[in-house]
Amino acid sequence: MMVLKGWDGYSLRLTLYPSFSLSMFKLDEDVYLKYLGLCKGLRIYDYGYDVVVLGGYCDIDYVRELCGVLEDPLNYVYEVELRFNDVYYYLVTQWRGVGLSTATRDFDHVFISIFLSKRTSYHDRVLQWVDSLFNIIDNPVDLINIDTSNLFKPPQIRELSGVFKEYFYNVRPYVVRGNINDVRYNLLRIKGVGPKITYAYLLHAMRFTEIAPIDTHFNYFIFNVLGLKYGMPKKELCLKYDCSKCNSNCVMKELRSFFGKSLGYLQTVVYIHVKMLCKKGRCYECVLRKYRLCKLKS
C-alpha cells in the first residue's frame, strides 16, 4: 500500500470523471479498479485529500499521472493572459477537487475511448462499449485482426477496427517517439478523425496541455461564459497549418495564445463546471457570476 499526496480539496472521483483514463477503471463502491491496460489490478481510492494505492507493482509516476496529482492546476495560473487570469484562478479554486488525469502509457486504450466518444455520451454509452469490446478482445492490437463492423450496431464501434489499423500503422510510431506535430498531422489524415478527436488525444494520451478538444461543454463556455466569438477548428485548415501559422478566425489559435500550457487544465475543469452548474441553471453557485466574470446574460 502507498499513499499519494494530493492538495487541499483534491478528489480522485472528480478528477477521473472527465478523463478518458476512466474507461480503464471499474468503480466498486469507493474503489477504482484498473481492469485494462498497464498496471491492471491496481486499486485506488480517495483518502481525505490523498489517494490510497493498492495492488501490484506500478511505476509511482504513472500512478500519480493516472490519479491526476502530477501537477496542481492552480500552478498554471501564471500561463494565463492577464485578461483571463481571474477566470482561470477562480474557476480552478471553485473546483479544487479536479486534477488532470492522463494515460500516456496506455495510449492505445485512450485512442479507442476517444474515437468511440464521437457524437455520443461518454458516461452513458462509451464506458459500456469499452467494457463490451474488451470482453471480446484482450488487447487493443487485437483490433487489427478483427472486423468490428460485423460485431456491433453503434456506428462508432463498427468503424473502429478500420480506423484503429490506420492509427496503429500511421500514427502510433510517432506517439512512441513523442513527436506531437507528426501525431497531430497523421491523426487528422484519418477519415472520421477531426480536430476534436485529435486534440483530445494529444491532451489525454500525450499530456500536451497546450491544446484541448472543443467538446460541447467547452464550446458553451468559450462562447457564452468567456464571450469569445471565433470560428471552430476546421480539419482542412488544421491539416495545412499549425495554429501559430494559421490566419483563419479560429478559436483554438486564440485559446492557445490566451492560456498556454494551462489550456488542458482549463478544459478539464470547464467540463465539470458546465455539466454541474451551467447546464443545470445553478448560476447562484458559480464563482464567475459572483465576481462578474461570466458574459452570459441572466
Question: Where do the protein language model's features map onto the residues?
Answer:
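Basic side chains
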Residues: K34, K40-R43, R119, K153, ...
